[in-house]
Amino acid sequence: MFYRIIFFSFLLINISCDIKSDELKISQNDSLANFISSFEEYTFDESHTSSYIYDQDKLHRFDIYLTDENLNRIDNDPAAEEYVEGFLVFEGKVIKNVGVRYKGSIGAWVGCLSSPDWINPNGYKICPKLSMKININWQGDKKFYGMKKLQFHSQNLDKSKMHERLGYYMYRNFGINAPRSNHALVYVNGEFTGLFANTENIDGPYTNQHFDGGGGNLYKEVWPVNSEGESRSDEYFKNGLKTNE
């Protein structure tokens, strides 16, 4: 299985370089609303499981659609990590009114924002791609293959595009609980954005999937000091607590 992942990933990295985006592209004479209405709306079914999304033998394609206004909004300040309304198309079906934003910690923004201050990331987007998060239930209680969120990691600093997928795969095979990850092709408004790591989001559905009962508290890591080297406040650490959804 390990060698199959390496071989498969080598192929998809080379294949993805030549991908054209003729399909699912909005024509000049069409509006986004009309274009989206041409798709059947996705409906969650109990037979839809997240195992399909993270199948190691699949190279899924995800199409994200945003108005020009919303795309410009997140492009102008990615580090704000502000959700805007968008649409997700997967295998010919659309999930409407999802939240779309860029995501990342300090390392994800290095060399990708107009400001050179990597400690306090700010400025507009200058990289071809950035990591993204899709909030399926941003408006209404919706699920996509049993999940509430998707995340696509740009891996801009990883020339192999393999570290994340292989790392999590090895952890799981060592018996350590870790997110599932494969690769995905991501398009934004019909344009090929790149090859991303499609990595499982750690949230309520994740704990339900991987831990018996899924109850308890879920913590997100927090950086212990600020840019001045001073310790964070107690309140800052409390805000790092994420309760299960």
Label each residue range with its predicted role:
Residues I5-I13:
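Sec-dependent N-terminal signal peptides
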